[in-house]
Amino acid sequence: RGISMNKSKKFIETKEYKRFVEFCQACIKYKYIGICYGLPGVGKTLSAKQYSNWNWVEKQIDYKKSEEIGMNADEKILEAKTIFYTAPAIRATKMTNEIDMIGGKMGMVKSMYRVLQLGAEEKYSTNVYEEIDLIIIDEIDRLKVQHLEQLRDIYDQKDVAMIFIGMPGIEKRLARYPQLYSRIGFAHEFDRLSKDEIHHILEYKWEE
């Protein structure tokens, strides 16, 4: 798992985090849906946000007016190809619209960065997932069957990989939906830190 220390905000790449990155890369490579499950507090959400650089991306796409689009972007935005989304307590169709909107905003910032910084001509794709290769859905446990159907729809139509993050047991629940379950290629259990790693991290923090 990844550990974030509040004081220095330094993310420590643990073995679990590295395993999670490999899992994400495998899902992208084979365009599969993957399930990641683990107990609360082991670092699932933190790792997904670190992998997607989401705290940074979120600021980039949080523009209010059109003239703000891409103003603060740097070349990192062109590498942003993962959407991180926390499962909401809203209607399934609204959820789809929200995910579409995130993809659209990321595409818009990339386009404007290319125009403003690289002198490219303005052109905007109608496919909001054109430069997205992975969608991570956190807290999948909260979703009803209608939401899962919508996610399957996005997966089938948009040619992107997906990862569902949830509690242990989520893989058994998803097995009840054969149409969705048949598309799941990988499962990844997110473990707690080993005693050795905790010791190593504490030593590392102590030295700072």
Predicted regions and their residues:
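Walker A/P-loop nucleotide-binding motif
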Residues: K31-S52
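Residue-level preference for the first positions of well-ordered beta-strands
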Residues: I33-I35, T82, I132-L134
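Sensor-1/coupling segment of RecA-like P-loop NTPase cores
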Residues: L143, I154-P178, H188
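Post-Walker A helix-loop "phosphate-sensing" segment adjacent to the P-loop in P-loop NTPases
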Residues: W54-M71, K76, G107
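A short hydrophobic beta-strand->loop->alpha-helix junction that borders the nucleotide-binding pocket
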Residues: K65-G70, A80-R91
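Charged, amphipathic alpha-helical linker segments immediately N-terminal to NTP-binding catalytic cores
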Residues: R1-K10
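Mid-core helix/loop region of P-loop NTP-binding domains shared across ATPases and GTPases
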Residues: K76-I77, P88-I137, R142-I154, L193-E208
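Pre-Walker A adenine-sensing motif
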Residues: K15-I28
